Amino acid sequence: MTDLLWILGAVVLAAAGGEAFLKSILGAALHLRVPKIIVATTLAAFATSAPELTGSTVAALAGQPEIGLGDALGSNVVNIGLIFGLALLYGAVQTTRADFGRDFYLALAVPLLTFLFALDGRIARGEAVVLLTIFLVWLAWVVRGALRRRGAAVDIGAGNLSPGKSLVLGVLGLGALIAAGRLFVGGATGIATALGVDAFVIGAVLVAVGTSLPELVTVILSRLRGHDDVGVGTLIGSNLFNGLAIVGIAGSIHPIAVPLAEVTLTLACGLIALLLLLPGRSGLIVRHRGVLLLILYAGFVLVTLKS
């Protein structure tokens, strides 16, 4: 009974936190006078990846950076396969070419680079530093571009939020999302354990979704409120943060031993999911892509559990 209450509490907390966090993103874009997608790709993406960053850093300091690697790469599959797949079921997403520029193609290149580093069965500190350096260069590039594109403030539905209120809403909203993720993982794990479900299954299926709950709520609410560019930017930015910063930090603290078969599967699924996200010339990502993404995610989970 307690576990069910935890899950219900997680749902309520996630809804409230997600609404506050989305308003904070829109408020930040308004006050900084930059496009919403830039704020989503940077601030929102980094904030929603906080659970993965915390977990991977703690694991690396404990001498188990493989946990951080699995969480980061697995979360990337969850982000696109599960989360955007669900978002597309609500309807097609209209994007622009600007939404799929350098950030998207870098997100495609990162899994290939990670695979090359992993071929010898480990990601060495030097290779992790390379990933982290690429992340910092990309971040500087995005910030520089944002400063160049600053213009007059435009009403984007953020209301009359002051910068201070936007910041407070962002902190409270993100805190609620992270807490909701922890409640969800705790409740679901308790139920699964009571039913005799294997611990690995719990980790692969439930914990991955729990740590990605901030992205899930942000993207779904962005869709419902008509801010699709926020959802797209958050997921692409989160994938870059996971693949470059989190793996880079974990590997810099401690070299990562790589189970090549599992990592190859995860990287391949993440890459295929990104390719399915690429829109046509009209910029439209059609609804049936969502079905394909969900099938891909389900296949990834099933194969992972059987391996």
PLM feature spans:
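Hydrophobic alpha-helical segments, chiefly the membrane-spanning helices
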Residues: 1-307
